[in-house]
From Swiss-Prot:
It comes from Corynebacterium glutamicum (strain R). 3-methyl-2-oxobutanoate binds at D52, S53, D91, K121. This is 3-methyl-2-oxobutanoate hydroxymethyltransferase. Pfam families: Pantoate_transf. The keyword Cytoplasm applies. PANTHER family: 3-METHYL-2-OXOBUTANOATE HYDROXYMETHYLTRANSFERASE. Its cofactor is Mg(2+). The active site is at E189.
């Protein structure tokens, strides 16, 4: 059961609105496989996000733009199979919703039907509001994503903080558009803490921050960053709670050494 936050045996979208009203923070982690999903679910995380970040941390690619809907569905199936309590949300990957609202609805329907997820996430603000509304009208819950949107990295000029200065007005407009379109939550990525706090106070839906300070209703991190499986350079907004990469490296070396020494398998591991 969770240490705090949403108190429910099975989390639904309505629980996020209730948590905001009650001033309860919500926790979100990414997951792309059954083993991590089961562990995080049992730990009490409120939402599991099958993010297109899998392109980077699972498939080893430089950008999220290349991951396909078919690949996302395979990963999401594994997560939903292992999850009993947390709400599972799946990213709509690049190229699956931009052409038209109809394309977006068809992609979202595939995700819901083939994975058993509870919602989809889509990047964009004012320009994507009509698409969000169409997905919601099809009976599919939506999480928005504004601020820095990784699928737009080239048009944004790279990994750049959004919502500073004059652009803060756009952030508010995007947030309101996402809410009015029917999303039940919105991710705020790489925006100034004060701007994220203002958006959070302005909206009635849940805000989930990543690199957006602690004034949002909840937080999300890529688990390989948060728990140190990724041994490379990490974003400034990541707090490392474990060093799993180093632990795995040391364990692999110990395994190799035992094989070379002829001590594995021993009597205890033999029939």
């Amino acid at each position: 059961m969770p240490m705090s936050g949403i108190d429910a045996k099975k989390i639904r979208t309505r629980h996020f609105r209730e948590a905001k009203v009650n001033g309860q923070k919500v926790s979100v982690l990414t997951s792309y496989d059954a083993l991590s999903a089961r562990i995080f679910d049992e730990a009490g995380v409120d939402m599991l996000l099958v993010g297109d970040s899998a392109a980077n941390v699972v498939l080893g690619r430089d950008t999220t733009l290349s991951i396909t809907l078919d690949e996302m569905i395979v990963l999401a199936k594994a997560v939903t199979i292992a999850t009993k309590r947390a709400l599972v949300v799946v990213d709509l990957p690049f190229g699956t919703y931009e052409v038209s609202p109809n394309q977006a609805v068809e992609s979202a329907i595939r995700i819901m039907r083939e994975t058993g997820a509870a919602a989809v996430k889509i990047e964009g603000g004012v320009e994507i509001a009509q698409t969000i509304r169409r997905i919601v009208d099809a009976g599919i819950p939506v999480v928005g994503h504004i601020g820095y949107t990784p699928q737009s990295e080239h048009s944004l000029g790279g990994h750049v903080v959004q919502g500073r200065g004059a652009s803060s007005g756009k952030l508010i407009a995007d947030a309101r558009a996402v809410e009015q379109a029917g999303a039940f939550a919105v991710v705020l990525e790489m925006v100034p803490a004060e701007a994220a706090r203002e958006v959070t106070e302005d909206l009635s839906i849940t805000t989930i921050g990543i690199g957006a300070g602690n004034g949002t209703d909840g937080q999300v991190l890529v688990w390989q960053d948060a728990f140190g499986l990724n041994r490379g350079k990490k974003p400034r907004f990541v707090r490392e709670y474990a060093t799993l990469g180093d632990s795995l490296h040391d364990a692999a070396q110990a395994y190799i050494a035992d094989i070379h020494a002829g001590t594995f398998p021993g009597e205890a591991e033999s029939f």
